[in-house]
């Protein structure tokens, strides 16, 4: 990436309000509802899959049907919990969680593909599950990144978050059509082994976490859906470039196809982080966008140099983690695109994605 990349992104985000807040007296939500995935059930009804945080920062994935006022998402009706940290690898001695789901409907597979962060014995690890109806999920297991000698490291050593799949096959580095996923490795192993510090892959000189892409050939997934957990051909897509994202960046909702290419809404973080796994941070999370080349989605062809949305409202500026706008889902409703986002790790908001030119 270079700052010579065009910075014009012909879209803007317009706030439409809060759609979900913690339900008083609900034990699974006492520390917040946030960072939702989304999808439609077979009958076409729109649902969110919010991260529900119980006491002790234990997260589950819920299901909530979206309600509307004058055609605009305005609330939800809860439908229960659809994924909990029930597996041993999703729980540690003093922690547990299935966190920050992203869900992509993949028509060629006839399935919703959920990525989530399993907060287990060795910290955060990405994992996958699939469903045909948003209610019944089948775990595919933790993601196992294929060894790539030219990186001079094993991606499985590192915490990894913000995994999200493209909704259709894209060209891989070898020209073969593949199911691709974006992800965000974090190179500092000091959280696991004090003093170990940062271990960068070969060719990477910036230790700030950025967005990567990995691929699985279509033929392998058609033979066995579990192949999605074994991505390879890892490539760096983007690193922090601008002041509003000076600490790190990460992918948001599944990329959507627009005239210019693949539109990726992402988050950027500025401020200071003393403990990467502490809830209270002196940081600001904002939403931006980039456009990826449809012929090679590892290439960024345009990128916003200013955030499309930064924390401004009370709900975005005050919460479990203050000053957070964290986009994680995007859906079309009556020809309009709405982005759902976490607000200060406490509430869920919605914004209209509008074309500006």
Question: What is each of the regions a protein language model found here?
Answer:
Residues 164-168, 252-254, 327-332:
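Beta-rich, blade/repeat-based domains predominating
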Residues 1-31, 35, 39-96, 105-160, ...:
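Beta-rich carbohydrate-recognition and catalytic domains
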């Amino acid at each position: 990436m270079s700052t010579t990349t065009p910075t014009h992104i012909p879209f803007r985000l317009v706030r439409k309000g809060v759609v979900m807040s913690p339900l008083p007296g609900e034990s699974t939500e006492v520390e917040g509802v946030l960072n939702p995935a989304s999808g439609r059930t077979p009958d076409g009804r729109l649902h969110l899959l919010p991260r529900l945080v119980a006491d002790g920062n234990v997260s589950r994935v819920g299901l909530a049907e979206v309600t509307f006022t004058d055609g605009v998402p305005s609330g939800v009706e809860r439908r229960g919990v659809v994924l909990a940290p029930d597996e041993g690898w999703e729980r540690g001695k003093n922690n547990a969680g299935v966190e920050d789901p992203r869900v992509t409907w993949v028509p060629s597979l006839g399935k919703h593909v959920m990525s989530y962060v399993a907060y287990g014995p060795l910290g955060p690890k990405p994992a996958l599950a699939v469903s045909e109806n948003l209610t019944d999920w089948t775990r595919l297991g933790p993601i196992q990144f294929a060894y790539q000698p030219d990186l001079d490291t094993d991606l499985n050593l590192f915490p990894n978050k913000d995994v999200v799949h493209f909704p259709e096959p894209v060209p891989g580095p070898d020209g073969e059509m593949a199911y691709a996923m974006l992800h965000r490795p974090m190179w500092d192993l000091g959280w696991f082994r004090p003093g170990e510090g940062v271990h960068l892959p070969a060719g990477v000189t910036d230790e700030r976490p950025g967005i990567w892409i990995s691929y699985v050939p279509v033929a392998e997934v058609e033979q066995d859906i579990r192949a999605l957990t074994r991505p390879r051909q890892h490539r760096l897509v983007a690193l922090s470039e601008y002041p509003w994202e000076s600490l790190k960046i990460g992918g948001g909702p599944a990329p959507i196809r627009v005239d210019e290419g693949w539109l990726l809404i992402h988050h950027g973080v500025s401020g200071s982080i003393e403990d990467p796994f502490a809830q209270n941070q002196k940081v600001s999370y904002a939403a931006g966008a980039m456009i990826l080349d449809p012929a090679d989605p590892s290439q960024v062809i345009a990128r916003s140099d200013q955030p499309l949305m930064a924390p401004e409202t009370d709900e975005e500026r005050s919460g479990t983690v203050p000053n957070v706008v964290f986009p994680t889902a995007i859906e079309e409703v009556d020809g309009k695109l709405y982005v759902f986002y976490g607000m200060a790790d406490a509430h869920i908001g919605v914004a209209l994605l509008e074309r500006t030119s």
